[in-house]
C-alpha cells in the first residue's frame, strides 16, 4: 500500500506539472496527513521539488507548489543500428543529458567488432554522466533483431549477419555497472510503445490497440493489444517482415520467397527506383536518404516504386487489421517521411467502399486509421526511455540508493 501511494503521488505530479498538496489530495483521494509523510520522502529521493508558491484554494494565501524533479538519475539507451551505435541519456523527467554516436562499419558476421564500439562509446558516456554528478539508474539496449529467452538473446540479425548472440551478457561482462541494471529490447517493439504514447497526447484519449510498422534497413514492427505488447510465447511474436505477401515471389534472407521484406523492403524499393548501385557503394542508409529526397522532388521512377510498395503495405495492413483490429496503424522509419507517396488508404475496409462488410475507421475523427509516425529516428530510444523510467518509478524509494 505504501509503494502504491508513493507511485500514485509521483504519477499525479508528473501529469499535472506544477501543483499543490491540496490539489494532489483532491485528485488522488489521499488524506493530507498521508501526504505529510509521503512528500518529504519523495523530495528526499529526488523525485519531487518545491518550487516557490502557487495560489491557494479559492484565491487564498499562496501555498508551496510541487513539481516533478528526477534530475539526479539518468536512464541510458544504447541503440545499435545497421551502421552506427548511438548512446543517449535522459533524466527521469525525460530531459536529454547527452547523446554520442560512433560508426561501427557494419562488419557482417562479426558481432564482436560491433560490441567493441558499443562498449567504448558506453563507457565514455557513463564517465561523462559521472562528471555531471548524475547517477546511472537503468540501461536499455535497443537492437533491430528478434529476441528470445529470459534473459533475452539476439536470435539472428540479417542486417548484420549475426546468428544467436548473447549481446546483453557480453555487454554486462565488460561494463559491470550494467549488472542487474540493463534491459535488452527489440527496436520496433519499444518504438510502438513510444508512438502510441505520442498519439495519446495528440488525440486526447488512450490507445490500447495499435499496430506499428517501420522500414529503414528492413521491415519490423510491434503490436499493442489491450494495452500490452505482443511478444508471444518465445519473445519473437510479431515479426511482420516475414509475413508472406506473394507466394513464389522474391527470395528473402529467411530462405523463403515472397516475404513482406523481400517484396516491399528497402532493398526491393531501392532496386525498383534505380538506386541499387548507390546502396551497394554507399550503404542502404545513404541510399534511403537519396530515395526520400527524390520522392520529395517528384522523381517519377521513385514515386512509381513507392506506389508499388504502398500496394503491398496496404495488403499487409489489411491482413494485420483482421488479426488484431487495432485503433490505428502507424508507419514509421522512412515510410513516415514518404507517407503520402505510398498512397496507402488512411481508412481501410473489405468490400466495395459503398457497401463494406468491415471498415476500419475512427468514428470520432480524432485521427485517420493509417497514419505516419510522429517520432522519427528517435522513436525506439523514446520507447526505451519510457520503459526504463516507468520501471524505476515503480519503486520510488529505491531511488534513494542513487543519492549520495
How does the language model describe each region?
Residues 180, 184, 188, 245-280:
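Glycine-rich phosphate-binding loop plus the immediately following alpha-helix
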Residues 91, 149, 224:
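Short, acidic, Ser/Thr-enriched surface-loop or helix-capping motifs
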Residues 202, 206-264:
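Glycine-rich phosphate-binding loop of actin/hexokinase-like ATP-binding domains
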Residues 53, 101, 159, 234-235:
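Short clusters of small/polar residues that mark proteolytic maturation junctions
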Residues 1-103, 107-127, 200-204, 260-404:
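ATP-binding/phosphotransfer module of carbohydrate and carboxylate kinases, centering on a glycine-rich
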Residues 96-209, 340, 344-356:
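Glycine-rich phosphate-binding loop and adjoining helix at the ATP-binding site
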Residues 65-67, 75-79, 136-140, 209-214, ...:
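Short glycine-aspartate micro-motif
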Amino acid at each position: 500500500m505504501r509503494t502504491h501511494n508513493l507511485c500514485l503521488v509521483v504519477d499525479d505530479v508528473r501529469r499535472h506539472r506544477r501543483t499543490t498538496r491540496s490539489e494532489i489530495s483532491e485528485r488522488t483521494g489521499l488524506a493530507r496527513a498521508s501526504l505529510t509523510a509521503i512528500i518529504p520522502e519523495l523530495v528526499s529521493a529526488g523525485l519531487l521539488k518545491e518550487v516557490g508558491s502557487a495560489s491557494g484554494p479559492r484565491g487564498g494565501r499562496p501555498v508551496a507548489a510541487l513539481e516533478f524533479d528526477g534530475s539526479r538519475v539518468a536512464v541510458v539507451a544504447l541503440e545499435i543500428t545497421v551502421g552506427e551505435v548511438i548512446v543517449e541519456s535522459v533524466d527521469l523527467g525525460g530531459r536529454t543529458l547527452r547523446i554520442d554516436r560512433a560508426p561501427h562499419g557494419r562488419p557482417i558476421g562479426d558481432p564482436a567488432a560491433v560490441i567493441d564500439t558499443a562498449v567504448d562509446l558506453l563507457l565514455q558516456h557513463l564517465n561523462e554522466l559521472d562528471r555531471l554528478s548524475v547517477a546511472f539508474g537503468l540501461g536499455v539496449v535497443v537492437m533491430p533483431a528478434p529476441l528470445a529467452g529470459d534473459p533475452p538473446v539476439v536470435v539472428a540479425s540479417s542486417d548484420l549477419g549475426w546468428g544467436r548472440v548473447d549481446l546483453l551478457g557480453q555487454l554486462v561482462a565488460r561494463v559491470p555497472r550494467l549488472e542487474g541494471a540493463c534491459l535488452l529490447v527489440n527496436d520496433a517493439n519499444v518504438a510502438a510503445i513510444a508512438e502510441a504514447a505520442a498519439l495519446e497526447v495528440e488525440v486526447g484519449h488512450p490507445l490500447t490497440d495499435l499496430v506499428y510498422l517501420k522500414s529503414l534497413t528492413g521491415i519490423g514492427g510491434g503490436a499493442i493489444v489491450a494495452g500490452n505488447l505482443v511478444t508471444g510465447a518465445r519473445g519473437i511474436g510479431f515479426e511482420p517482415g516475414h509475413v508472406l505477401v506473394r507466394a513464389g515471389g522474391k527470395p528473402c534472407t529467411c530462405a523463403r520467397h515472397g516475404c513482406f521484406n523481400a517484396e516491399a523492403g528497402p532493398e526491393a524499393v531501392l532496386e525498383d527506383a534505380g538506386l541499387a548501385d548507390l546502396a551497394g557503394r554507399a550503404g542502404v542508409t545513404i541510399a534511403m536518404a537519396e530515395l526520400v529526397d527524390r520522392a520529395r522532388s517528384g522523381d517519377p521512377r521513385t514515386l512509381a516504386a513507392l506506389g508499388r510498395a504502398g500496394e503491398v503495405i496496404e495488403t499487409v495492413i489489411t491482413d494485420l487489421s483482421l488479426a488484431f483490429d487495432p485503433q490505428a496503424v502507424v508507419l514509421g522509419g522512412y515510410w513516415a517521411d514518404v507517407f503520402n507517396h505510398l498512397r496507402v488508404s488512411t481508412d481501410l475496409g473489405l468490400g466495395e467502399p459503398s457497401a463494406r462488410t468491415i471498415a476500419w475507421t475512427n468514428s470520432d475523427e480524432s485521427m485517420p486509421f493509417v497514419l505516419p509516425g510522429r517520432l522519427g529516428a528517435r522513436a525506439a530510444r523514446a520507447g526505451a526511455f519510457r520503459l526504463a523510467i516507468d520501471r524505476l518509478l515503480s519503486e520510488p524509494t529505491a531511488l534513494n540508493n542513487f543519492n549520495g
